[in-house]
Amino acid sequence: MKNTAQWLVVTGVFLVSHVELVLLLSAVLLLVTQYRAIYKPKRLLYLIPIWIISLTATWLVGYEFTKPIQQILIVTAFVLLYEQFFQFNRLHLLSLFRKYIFMSYLICLIGCLQELIFMATGINVIEYLPSYHSTRLVSAYLMRITSTLAEGGNLGIAIMPALVYLFIYRDPCQILGRRKWVVLLVALLTLSPFVYIFCVIAFFWHLNRFFGRYKTVTGVLVAAVVIFGVVMLEPFGASYKTDLGIWDRIGDSYTAVARMGNSRLNTVVSKSRTPSSTVLATHMYVGLHAPSRLLGTGIGTHPQSYAALVHAKYKKTDMNLNVDDGYALFNRILSEFGFVGLLLYVAFLIRFFNSGNMINVCFLSMMVCLFLRGGNYVLYGTVFAHFFYCYTSRFKLSV
């Protein structure tokens, strides 16, 4: 039953949150039935004061409580169930990780099938799934792969731990072997900027290993590859109908963040060429200028701050992208939990970091990506990644 429970959970990581919750609940019920035990919910001791402070902050700024209470119930359910699951599996984390890597491969195979069908028929068969976003085209016959997830960016982040394991640690457990190239190909076709940044980092990593003693040679080769990548990937990264290229999106986002010190939203988002950088800048603006910047406005209140600062003040009623999740965990934590919450989250990442455990490092990569692009607290394995990160902080694992 433990193997079945693990497969249920790693499958849920790549599906929408309500399906993930159902699969997680099923896995926990299987384990409770098999072992006839329930662990004390110790994480609840941390959640209770957080929720009390959060609701108090919401009350002080005069916001409505409907969405905050909904978010509290959802996050609490995920945390309590994942705590039970990881307690049952605390001695079998490597087995669970192996299943996650293999499931990443299966999800990538679905992505390959999605791309092949689109190339042959022009139909994106995945767009009929619930919660799926619009199809993004790279050319008339090539689209951004999403597989079972809503966007290519979501898929790129969800398989990031697999990329780190396969191409930084080089698959020491021999989980995929040569099949790892399928994962890399699909990752590249998601056109997620994080995937391309990872490729540059991986290249630096391996180049340093081979030419570590020859710093000048290493520097010249790195510079040449970066320049080549910018020149060659830019036309490929440009979306056929909807987006500018990968490097344009990265550069435009940097420019938007650099203007964040301005107190006027119109100045912050002016000259933005890409929708993603405009959305990033807008939500970061909300995070910096919402009420109660020390403790935030409370969980689930970012849409209310967004409505007050963007819709009402600047009459920008057409800017509704990512209004619920804030585009990035950084924005949402800053908006809803203030600077104190943001500092506590960074402290959490530092406290549980374990460079001697490859699984810990792999999931840190995913959490860093979510910090910059992915503000939903429970979507696509967010809670799963945080629990894996915590439970692998106590021991070393390198093969």
Where are these regions (language model features)?
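Transmembrane signal-anchor hairpin modules in multi-pass inner-membrane enzymes, especially those
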Residues: 1-60, 172-174, 211, 217-220, ...
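Loop-to-helix entry and N-terminal half of a specific, functionally important transmembrane alpha helix
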Residues: 4-8, 52, 222, 320, ...
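Helix-loop-helix junctions and helix-breaking kinks within/between transmembrane helices
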Residues: 13-27, 63-71, 150-157, 178-215, ...
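Transmembrane alpha-helices of multi-pass inner-membrane enzymes
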Residues: 26-31, 164, 203-204, 215, ...
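Alpha-helical transmembrane segments of multi-pass inner-membrane proteins
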Residues: 98-128, 140-141, 147-209
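Hydrophobic transmembrane alpha-helices and their immediate junctions
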Residues: 173-176, 203-216, 314-316, 322, ...
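Long extracytoplasmic/lumenal interhelical loops at the membrane interface
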Residues: 264-337
